[in-house]
């Protein structure tokens, strides 16, 4: 499951200017000059700036006070302050999205891809997969900021079974997060 084409486009139209703002104001990564207009971006370089935004969430307020965005767009960007960064176990793929389990809290999230589904991105890897990611709201869905790192960890049957149980309990208790 992914965002529809228009929402995916809108995400990047909102996300890249925020990154540019943070990078220019705080000189986070001098290797990047113009994220919004770049033809090609190195994800590891962009991640440096994104991590700065997530670690200094007040940058979002500063950005919104300096730029006059339409209310709808302002609301979307403001919602990103509800981000959740950390390690997640990608446990399974479903029609509604992919199941992410927080390694810290064992909370279960249904996460959508932006342009490409998680299943397509990780078709070559057996599940479960340990990821470092930042989950953010986008309208009524959960997505990542698009800058995910895979951890080189293989889980045995015991852990895989435990992750399955966490998911099944969350499903039974209706405690899966579909939005933030």
Which residue ranges define each predicted feature?
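Short linear interaction motifs
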Residues: 66-84, 109-115
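Short nucleic-acid-contacting surface segments enriched for D/E, G, S/T with interspersed K/R
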Residues: 115-134
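OB-fold/S1-family single-stranded nucleic acid-binding modules
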Residues: 134-177
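OB-fold/S1-family RNA-binding modules
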Residues: 22-29, 33, 166-179
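A structured, charge-rich N-terminal accessory region that forms the first stable segment of a protein
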Residues: 1-71
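Structural detector for short beta-strands of small beta-barrel domains
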Residues: 78-96
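OB-fold (S1/OB) nucleic-acid-binding surfaces
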Residues: 91-114
